[in-house]
Amino acid sequence: MNIAKIVREAREQSRLTTLDFATGIFDEFIQLHGDRSFRDDGAVVGGIGWLGDQAVTVVGIQKGKSLQDNLKRNFGQPHPEGYRKALRLMKQAEKFGRPVVTFINTAGAYPGVGAEERGQGEAIARNLMEMSDLKVPIIAIIIGEGGSGGALALAVADRVWMLENSIYAILSPEGFASILWKDGTRAMEAAELMKITSHELLEMDVVDKVISEVGLSSKELIKSVKKELQTELARLSQKPLEELLEERYQRFRKY
């Protein structure tokens, strides 16, 4: 698949969402709401579910599948209260010894005036700091777009995976082309230079695993992700805490 098709597929409105994975993978998934400071952000969803006999905290960025739903979800662009909700749930997971799984699909954090006034940069930075030392296993999965710091704020993890037809980048190809050439129409040319596809990033050790989507139905893909999570969470849970945190630190330090 060429780069243009991959970008289109990553942005496809009908693509599986965080809630699709959360309800399909985890038994008895219960959503939790609010950041306990300002409000609940519909762009970030999270809660608790069971993976076998293991309670897991699930957090992710949610896009809509219709115009009305996208308005509710702010087109998958979180406000600072969304990142603070995510952090609240992750700290709760740490308190009760639950591993964390995050699902990421965003063009980036919302850049509006209100979001900036409420501390968008601080919220993202705090997530990076807190996740780097969170004392439970973390697995992050990019399921569509992984855009800039808005994606990274949920991706400081022990394992970072990508669905095969997803992308992960410092900014959009359109933004890159506009900055580099002052011409947003050269977006796909920019995408080639940026190395944003799953297999390119796996080759560069930015991500740890690519989950194949070829020939799989939605149910089969969810089942595949569930199997991978069960295996990897069992492995990570066996690691001594000091070793887990040191490996997480070194994983990001090497960049």
Swiss-Prot record:
A Pfam family assignment: ACCA
Subcellular location(s) of the protein: Cytoplasm
EC annotation from Swiss-Prot or TrEMBL: 2.1.3.15
PROSITE patterns in the record: COA_CT_CTER
GO BP: any one term: fatty acid biosynthetic process
GO molecular function list: acetyl-CoA carboxylase activity; ATP binding; carboxyl- or carbamoyltransferase activity
Predominant cellular place of this UniProt entry's protein: cytoplasm
Gene Ontology CC terms: acetyl-CoA carboxylase complex
Pathway as given in its UniProt record: Lipid metabolism; malonyl-CoA biosynthesis; malonyl-CoA from acetyl-CoA: step 1/1
Gene3D superfamilies: 2-enoyl-CoA Hydratase, Chain A, domain 1
Keywords in alphabetical order: ATP-binding, Cytoplasm, Fatty acid biosynthesis, Fatty acid metabolism, Lipid biosynthesis, Lipid metabolism, Nucleotide-binding, Transferase
NCBIfam families the UniProt entry points to: accA, AccA_sub, PRK05724.1, PRK12319.1
Function: Component of the acetyl coenzyme A carboxylase (ACC) complex. First, biotin carboxylase catalyzes the carboxylation of biotin on its carrier protein (BCCP) and then the CO(2) group is transferred by the carboxyltransferase to acetyl-CoA to form malonyl-CoA.
Family to which the UniProt record says this protein belongs: Belongs to the AccA family.
Protein name per Swiss-Prot or TrEMBL: Acetyl-coenzyme A carboxylase carboxyl transferase subunit alpha
Lineage: Bacteria, Bacillati, Bacillota, Bacilli, Lactobacillales
